[in-house]
Amino acid sequence: MIQPRKELDGVLLVDKPTAHTSHDVVARLRRKLNMKRIGHAGTLDPMATGLMILLIGKATTISQYLTSLDKEYEGTIELGKVTDSQDADGEVLSTLPVPPFTEAEIRAAMAGFMGDQYQTPPMYSAIKVDGVPLYKTARKGGEVEREPRFIRVSSFELTRFALPQFDFRLRCTKGTYVRTIAHDLGQRLGCGAHLAALRRTATDKFKLADALTLDAIEALPLPEIEKRLIPVYQAAPSIVG
């Protein structure tokens, strides 16, 4: 029988495993801590891994601030395959031959995604149109017009070149769909592409290196978890007096 536990307050950095939704992560932590007031500051797709900022107790009050911070990612883009979800979890819609691009050509194409821009969200997303999440419409084979959203990409670097794949490092504003950048890059190159892997490495000052895996957190006694919590005033010093 689960015993009532001390109510905790603070920010906990978690390394999300693949094949978990962001809701799955929150649910596991709620069971571990036996408390409901737990949220997060930025969704990761099931395929993606890496940093999730979990908000426990009173830390849920700074959700909007933490969600607004820039994110950093490392990932892999695969050329030649287009999927319906724009990532490796989706069904392949088309396969095209990949031209013998040079590293310089890939870097030049990536440079075209730098700076301020408007991005059309993918159909496989939780954004609602007329009250219906886009992914529900997409699963039924439908498609609706989506309003482009402002984003900013402040860095987009090539870190490994091995066609048909290449690795990258990216820093962007909230609400940026990295898989859409991968898809759109493939369209510009004329051979299609999808996001093959993604790992969030930072959200502003919060780093993946300081996070624990879910399994590690679940194995810790409550006092040890409490020691890992970042106080609310420290997580958001500019808005907490």
Swiss-Prot record:
EC number(s) stated in the UniProt entry for this protein: 5.4.99.25
Reaction equations catalysed: uridine(55) in tRNA = pseudouridine(55) in tRNA
Active-site residues, as the UniProt record annotates them: D45 (nucleophile)
Disulfide partners: none
EC class (word): isomerase
Keyword tRNA processing: yes
GO biological processes: mRNA pseudouridine synthesis; tRNA pseudouridine synthesis
Keyword presence, Chloroplast: no
GO molecular function: RNA binding; tRNA pseudouridine(55) synthase activity
Keyword field: Isomerase, tRNA processing
Alphabetized NCBIfam families for the sequence: TruB
Family: Belongs to the pseudouridine synthase TruB family. Type 1 subfamily.
Function description: Responsible for synthesis of pseudouridine from uracil-55 in the psi GC loop of transfer RNAs.
PANTHER family reported for this sequence: PSEUDOURIDYLATE SYNTHASE TRUB1, TRNA-PSEUDOURIDINE SYNTHASE
Protein's UniProt name: tRNA pseudouridine synthase B
Provenance organism: Opitutus terrae (strain DSM 11246 / JCM 15787 / PB90-1)
